[in-house]
Amino acid sequence: MKNVVILGAGYAGLTTLKGLKKAAKAGEVKVTLVNKNSYHYDTVNLHEVSAGNIPSRDICIDIKDVVTPGVSFVQDEVIKIDTEKKLVLTKKYEIDYDVLVIGLGFQPETFGIEGMAENAMPIANVLAAEKIAATLEDNFRKYATSEEKDVKDISVIVGGTGLAGMEFLGELVHRKKELCSKYGIDEKLVKIYGLDAAPTLLPMFTKEYSDYARKYLEDNGIEIILGAGIKGATADSFIIEVDGERKELKASTLVWTAGVRGNKLMDETFPELSKRGRLVTTQQLTVPGMEDIYIVGDCAAFIETGQERPYPTTAQIANQMGAYVGARISGKPVGDFKYINRGVVCSLGHKDGIADVMGGKKSKGFKAAKLKKIIEAKAIYELTDFVTALKNQRIL
């Protein structure tokens, strides 16, 4: 019986597991899922938790709900992978494998910017998101209760205006109103900045749609500064350079969304193949020269035949990678991995957004926001099952 070990219960890991459940139940394979936490969390909803608009429990799924007969779950942190001995070492266990699936997710990347890792909070996981939400409210409370009002306490700087940054800024539109009402603060005093070194906003959308997103945020009091090279961070500021001029923006809440990398364990395990925690896989998502090891999700840099660059790491491609690997390990004739890009949606809070989905269908406003929720509901179903999706309130 083939012994399959899956590292990580993210999108790719759980879709791999779902594809193996039938074979595991039939006793054709033995599956072990290893994850640091007892839960899976929806990375695509971390921005909502970070703003404080929803509790973290709303985006978490207990792993015990997805473990079925023939599947074992080990809650522990992976510290080493020995590819020669075919062993996974965690803090407590040694786990042998015949087939290994590595889906250990992403880590923040600050590109060596001075003070960034020490001072800015990344939207990296559930605990990080909860910290941002708590810091944001603590600072508003501090402003409201202090005799000497310091506007930096009700100021927020977001480094990065990619999808993660823009969606977080969209959530802040609602949260700002809520906190100002709660603590009796004039909304006009609040300063929120979205910074990016890029000259354009959301290049995956048409200019009409990216302009729509920018206008929505700016109409709600958020300042977008493009072409802003972020040079450093202090405990209460970002140092930026715009058109050759350096300036310091002050804020007590500093958030970083401008960079991610794959898991550092990738560089340690495959030093000659991995760069910034990502490994260029074969067309079957395996490690070159190691057909028994699959790389999926944020750790995988998949370059399709005929292309020059890897696809961006998204939940969409992670789900497709997991489904492919689960099918391939089960012995189904799947051929090479082919990614189907079904489009992109950017929410701007829970009532607005922009969307450009498969077939060139575009929408904006409330319709796009609802489309995002429908896509999220479908993703949870693909990861688990209908009952679990209902339990986690992802079916609308």
Regions found by a protein language model. Give the residues of each.
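FAD-binding core/adjacent interface of flavoenzyme oxidoreductases
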Residues: 1-3, 73-155, 159, 244, ...
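Beta1-alpha1 glycine-rich phosphate/pyrophosphate-binding loop at the start
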Residues: 1-72, 166-204
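Short glycine-rich anion-binding loops that position phosphate/pyrophosphate groups of nucleotides
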Residues: 12, 105-108, 169, 260-262
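A Rossmann-like FAD-binding core segment of flavoenzymes
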Residues: 73-80, 174-282
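FAD-site-proximal beta/loop scaffold in flavoenzymes
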Residues: 118-150, 248-320
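Internal hydrophobic alpha-helix adjacent to the cofactor/substrate pocket in enzyme cavities
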Residues: 174-177, 315-342
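C-terminal auxiliary extensions adjacent to catalytic cores
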Residues: 350-396
